[in-house]
Amino acid sequence: MASLIYRQLLSNSYVTNISDEVNEIGTKKTTNVTVNPGPFAQTGYAPVDWGHGELPDSTLVQPTLDGPYQPTSLNLPVDYWMLIAPTREGKVAEGTNTTDRWFACVLVEPNVQNTQRQYVLDGQNVQLQVSNDSSTSWKFILFIKLTPDGTYTQYSTLSTPHKLCAWMKRDNRVYWYQGATPNASESYYLTINNDNSNVSSDAEFYLIPQSQTAMCTQYINNGLPPIQNTRNIVPVNITSRQIKDIRAQINEDIVISKTSLWKEMQYNRDIIIRFKFANSIIKSGGLGYKWSEISFKPMNYQYTYTRDGEEVTAHTTCSVNGVNDFNYNGGTLPTDFAISRFEVIKENSYVYVDYWDDSQAFRNMVYVRSLAANLNDVVCSGGSYSFALPVGNHPVMSGGAVTLTSAGVTLSTQYTDYVSLNSLRFRFRLAVSEPSFSISRTRMSGIYGLPAVNPNNNAEYYEIAGRFSLISLVLTNDDYQTPIANSVTVRQDLERQLGELREEFNSLSQEIAVSQLIDLATLPLDMFSMFSGIKSTVEAVKSMTTNVMKRFKTSSLANAISDLTSNMSEAASSVRLTSVRSVGTVTLPRARVSLQVSDDLRSMQDVSTQVSNVSRNLRLKEFTTQTDTLSFDDISAAVLKTKLDKSTQISQQTMPDIIAESSEKFIPKRSYRIVDEDTAFETGIDGTFYAYKVDTFNEIPFDMERFNKLVTDSPVLSAIIDFKTLKNLNDNYGITKKQAMELLHSNPKTLKEFINNNNPIIRNRIENLISQCRL
């Protein structure tokens, strides 16, 4: 049936999320571990998985073979092999340190007898004696001179068929490959000044880091890999590699989008969070041997620090949630040491730190999205506290430690003595650390966690470093600061939208086709089908459903169900959570309703008031005992679905309120019926009550005792066609006993037959119910 949407919302209405905990932290500091989820609950807590998102990686990944580069003159970087790959004979490269070393490398083709060849070296024409006896290998010859006017002499040779040679500057030396491939090896020959030695290459070359010397040796002896495996297909200028390192701006304001009035600003900030715990130690009256309470308290802390050369004034508020209560009792005598209650934070606890500073990022923190943070961990270690007894040695509680790890960030408001500040609430999960805490001269020892007795360990503060990022919608005029009080306009705008939407919803009632409504009321509408027809929200069904469930949890229907089942933990644990229809056989709700009915009938003198209160509970019983008959909730859900599809003003913001409000206000004048053989009992929320025979519709006296017993054992039915309508129908048209029973049980097929036959009495009744679906 269509009321499945309400059942699904109820089954998920007990899910708790982080925003609930954030809203309740100010009023509920201690969290009880006991959870009573109710018969419709699927889980106690929603899965929450916080992450820091993508982090920039500063790791430098160097290619093994960097190049090829175009022929050029450069100051070769230290600890890099310059692998030269000439394509023809002649001068390959030359270099100098401009003082006492000039060196040159030439390439000689195979089968060259001892001969004189002319080369241009250091700007001069030079005659050099070269030769190459090999018929297959090319020969690299290294020449060196020690003075500007000196003569080049042969220093080393490398024979290879691959036409590859390499040298490197390292430790004020020049390293070079010599010998013959495939057994060529590196060696050094020169002592030079690395800073002032330039190299001029007449051929394409590659750069290989010194850490990859083994790979360079492999290239020299075996040749380069195929060209498509190298980094640059087309040789580039070496200057393209010499890009200056630019330090990223850690704290920056980036304009994401901008219009004439508004702009989106992304604020990236480094942050230093300093906080401290506060505690309260209360001593009991009497002889002075007992303490009543040691507890955590919220603590405000203000400080300044330097961020990117700017002094920042920050304000933090530290509070805890989910504390664990411990106690120690040394005996029953008045002089026995005892602590009635002392708080300890452990793995199941959370620490909240609200942070605000006077930077630009917090000036207009009203409309915020894409909030993220990345923070370091911090260890909080407990100190010692001596319990001063009137006589005897003083017990000392000492030790205890926890590690705080970032678990998320949300928006919050800090309330100081003077102002309220829109701030960031950083949520930390805890892990216990060494050492454990103990109370000396007692048996209490080896307990892990951080007790409230001295959580700061006499330190001025705890400090956490990190960074956060957020995108805020601010006015284009930077001189205008959005007042914090203006944040209430968000709700005011929502109320205005809801008002307009209510008017539209109420006006749509007359556009609903009665026959189609019955068909829709018999469909099992789930949350997806309920929302999928709304424009621009198909992609957002998941997030919208979450918001609707959160709002529905506070509706009067959800609260009534919660009250009805507050003492049903055993029944709740036996309910199959995979199907809402499995709730149809609960016995305890019936007993509870019966007990409530009995109490009402005995305690109240006004029968009309009795019946009105009973009828309200009968709706809850009908809701927990789903049948195949049509109910008021089926009709209200069908009307809601129809109006949602027709509405032009529905939105994700207004949807939660509309869904919850429809469950409370649609069809306020309801009547419920219990059929006992040939007798029907009918009661209304407005206080009306009838008892009549089902075959003649003749009214009979209302038997309270009989009705009270039937409430426990008989199913409750929605009186879609109430007693007055049935009697009018029978008097004017005449109906068979079978039709009467089907109308009494709100059979949708029979109802549709009467509507399709244009029966004015039935049609007017359904139209009256539709008109009651108002907000």
Swiss-Prot record:
Gene3D superfamilies: 1.20.5.170, 2.60.120.200. One of its GO terms (cellular component) is host cytoskeleton. The keyword Coiled coil applies. Disulfide bonds join C318-C380. A motif (YGL motif) lies at residues 448-450. Residues 389-409 are annotated as: Hydrophobic. It holds the Pfam family VP4_haemagglut. GO terms for biological process: permeabilization of host organelle membrane involved in viral entry into host cell; virion attachment to host cell. The keyword Disulfide bond applies. The record marks R231, N232, R241, Q242, R247, A248 as: Cleavage. Residues 248-479 are annotated as: Spike body and stalk (antigen domain). A motif (DGE motif) lies at residues 308-310. Residues 65-224 are annotated as: Spike head. Residues 510-775 are annotated as: Spike foot. Keywords: Capsid protein, Coiled coil, Disulfide bond, Hemagglutinin, Host cell membrane, Host cytoplasm, Host cytoskeleton, Host endoplasmic reticulum, Host membrane, Host-virus interaction, Membrane, Outer capsid protein, Viral attachment to host cell, Viral penetration into host cytoplasm, Viral penetration via permeabilization of host membrane, Virion, Virus entry into host cell. Residues 484-511 form a coiled coil. InterPro entries: ConA-like_dom_sf, Rota_A_VP4, Rota_VP4_MID, Rota_VP4_MID_sf, VP4_concanavalin-like, VP4_helical. Belongs to the rotavirus VP4 family. This strain probably does not use sialic acid to attach to the host cell. In group A rotaviruses, VP4 defines the P serotype. This is Outer capsid protein VP4. The lineage of its organism: Viruses, Riboviria, Orthornavirae, Duplornaviricota, Resentoviricetes.
